[in-house]
């Protein structure tokens, strides 16, 4: 199940750090971006943060998947 996360996004920091190793960089886009988390059996397996850059342009800032679920 994919869930749109609108608050307390930082609780997924460990997952986001898999794709962006600097917490300071994550802090720059996390709150202004739209966040989606993929759950399986109530466990977050993947996360994606997308920002609106204006002029009908969106950018994927972070897309992270737990290592054991990558390449599937």
Regions found by a protein language model. Give the residues of each.
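Short amphipathic alpha-helix that is part of the acyltransferase structural core
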Residues: 1-27, 37
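Short, small/polar residue-rich loop motifs at catalytic or cofactor-binding pockets
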Residues: 30-32
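Conserved beta-strand in the GNAT
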Residues: 37, 43-52, 56-64
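Conserved glycine-rich acetyl-CoA-binding loop
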Residues: 66-72
């Amino acid at each position: 199940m994919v869930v749109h996360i609108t608050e307390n996004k930082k609780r997924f920091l460990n997952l986001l750090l898999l794709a962006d190793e600097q917490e300071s960089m994550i802090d720059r886009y996390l709150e202004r971006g739209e966040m989606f988390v993929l759950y399986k059996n109530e466990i977050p397996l993947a996360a994606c943060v997308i920002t609106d850059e204006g002029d009908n342009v969106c950018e994927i800032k972070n897309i992270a998947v737990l290592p054991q679920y990558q390449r599937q």
